[in-house]
Amino acid sequence: MNELIKHKLELLPDSPGCYLHKDKAGTIIYVGKAKNLRNRVRSYFRGSHDTKTELLVSEIADFEFIVTGSNTEALLLEINLIQENMPKYNIKLKDDKSYPFIKITNEPFPRLLITRQIKKNDGLYFGPYPDAYTATEVKKLLDRIFPFKKCKNPVNKVCFYYHLGQCQAHTICHTDKAYWDSLVADVKQFLNGKDDKIIDDLRSKMLEASHNQEFERAAEYRDLISGIATMRTKQRVMSKDLQDRDIFGYFVDKGWMCVQVFFVRQGKLIQRDVNMFPYYNEAEEDFLTYVGQFYSDQRHLIPKEVFIPETIDETLVAAIVPARIVKPQRGEKKQLVALATKNARVSLQQKFDLLEKDLRKTSGAIEHLGQLLGIEKPVRIEAFDNSNIQGTSPVAAMVVFVDGKPSKKDYRKFKIKTVIGPDDYASMREVIYRRYSRVKHEGLQAPDLIIVDGGQGQVKAARDVIEHQLGLSIPVAGLQKNDKHQTHELLFGNPLAVVELPRNSEEFFLLHRIQDEVHRFAITFHRQVRSKNAFSSKLDHIAGLGPKRKQLLLKRFKSMTALEQASLEEIQQLGIPKTVAEALFDHLTSKSEV
């Protein structure tokens, strides 16, 4: 068991869901379901197993999980994931290309059938069901409750089921279409979970039979009610309208966004897409940008419907996605979006929790890191990251790790003062010079290692300042991210070269944590500065409203939206002169009326 799996096992939720075991290449090799993900997944890595399971466990290099709302949902999601991914360790059904549905034919005398093929305009379909046994059990229950035609005999002949009270085709004439339409409508209501009327009717018949001392018939009605109860747990993962749709949910925290997309095809949740990335603007804006990029990828086919969270403007999504955009307001469809959002929250929290785990081993990690770089053990590490959007409101941040743990009292923020426009190299030079000129001239504690977020350009800029401008001797390394904004490579040495670092090592885990922390700190500061600047710039033309009063307003109202909703009295309560407060209030009022 590698370190990544050890950390992930500690973070599993006590929830029902599906888990996906992966090999070193990232290929899904097994899909399973669990009433309790924490207990089930942990069981693979504890105790002894049979030969087949031992072989599976030996190939597991990573795993993912999807939280569901019930064990029924987990079961149905499992069969969809197996069908879609065909993992080599899953037992394949003999007819694994399709799953059974219950069909109501559109014949003059409708019949209930079990089928594995869906044909358009050929009847109504309900399902899919996880196996033929389940579908058969449901059909048996329907046959006992609803008197559909059971066989292909001519309607002028009495069949066996007529004598059981389970077929009325012989007694209902061809012209009584309303009867059959009503029966079909009752089945649709029943299979969609609206079964209270049926249960009330059966309960009345049971009581009547019992009153008449027809105890066998009363027991039959009792069994029917019990059978219905076993079907009442409705699952949200499957959609009964067989519609193709993508379901989006997202969650943001600590400067990061996680977006989860559930792919529903023919009513089945067949796959999900998970992506985590830092966001720089408002969450809704960056979510829209992500959706646009998502569908520009030719691998992602556009479905008939796209479900989005209610905080998102559907007209903006409709402008970039040629599909029906839906913001579900109630019921199962809203719960599907909520489920995607819940999984986004769980995934993002897992990312943060992974970075917090196993700090006791970081002492060994920093010692090994020093050995890899050929330097003394880097007890104190200072890491830097720049943050700006096309050069606006440029800032930088520094985080400090001592003995592998964050020392937040030593964190520092920098506003870029000498650089105009988006120039990461010049910004890095400025920040490094400001920080280490103080270290040199004020006798502050110097780090054992400097890490900059970036590639060769950033490393060379920082090293040039340290060595040539300040005459210091502090090692400088660089951390590069891949196109998914994940820690990818460590650069060090002269000339710079990639340091071979095992992905599952404690050293890599530590560097990943440092890079994520400095990035989080930088973009959080950048967002604060941008918000403050935007707030101030909108008030620049108000006479008598200087920097101190703007700061006072920002501290009290937090945002322009809140300020625009403030009354004149609330503004004056801050000690702002009446004439200035009135000018500000008039400006805000006229702005809101435009």
From Swiss-Prot:
Cellular compartments per GO CC:
cytoplasm; excinuclease repair complex
Q: Domain UVR, which positions?
A: 196-231
The entry's localization annotation reads:
Cytoplasm
The UniProt keywords, alphabetically, are:
Cytoplasm, DNA damage, DNA excision, DNA repair, Excision nuclease, SOS response
| InterPro entries xref list | GIY-YIG_endonuc, GIY-YIG_endonuc_sf, GIY-YIG_UvrC_Cho, RuvA_2-like, UVR_dom, UVR_dom_sf, UvrABC_protein_C, UvrC
Q: Which domain of life is it from?
A: Bacteria
Predominant place of localization: cytoplasm
What is this protein for, i.e. what is its function?
Answer: The UvrABC repair system catalyzes the recognition and processing of DNA lesions. UvrC both incises the 5' and 3' sides of the lesion. The N-terminal half is responsible for the 3' incision and the C-terminal half is responsible for the 5' incision.
Which protein are we looking at? UvrABC system protein C
Q: Which organism is it from?
A: Streptococcus equi subsp. equi (strain 4047)
Q: Which gene encodes it?
A: uvrC
